[in-house]
Amino acid sequence: ANQLALFTQKLAQTTGGTNRDAAQLTVLAMTGVTAMTRQTAYQMELFGSEWPAEVVGPELAAADITHISNEVPFVAGCKVNLAEDNFNFCSKPSYLDSLTLSGVDIIGLTGNHQNDFGYDAARDSLAFYEENGLPVYGGGIDKTAAFAPYYRTANGTRFAFLGANMYGPSFAWATDNRPGSAEYDLGILSATIRSIKEKNLADVVLVELQWQES
């Protein structure tokens, strides 16, 4: 113990101490892809809209910032479809309860199922997020919105969130006049990151990328 204390003291003298400040530490929880559809939706119909979050929800909510990459749109009238060949996904608006219980602060929209029920349904889902105070990035009402960074500050640290989708298909990507995910473009992402750093808009830049179906 004495040797460790001596080592720590000498290390501090050599490096000039530490810049660690507990008051500025931020816990960021990023879950990866969420899709409340098919078998998950079936279980939610049986056990309630908060079922997926009953165990993990409080843990996620304890973070300073909680992020969900939500793969599918919220669609009024969405029906549970368990068919193995069904690849058109949606979630009932009531399923938002699981995200609320999980303390979700930010929604990543880099998935390729946002437009499965059409562009109008995708727009309605975006409006639903806004109505419930959930900011989105990596997707949006059009290409400009999809590529726009989302900024958030926690405990004195400024974060910038960006996202894009490499996999497609093309109807899943946002254009100048339709919603969707941001189509991966290294040039756009690189320029955006440079701009953020040059303008000192964030301390940490996080980029979410959906590659293939992962």
Model-derived regions: residue spans:
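Acidic, metal/ion-coordinating pockets
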Residues: 2-214
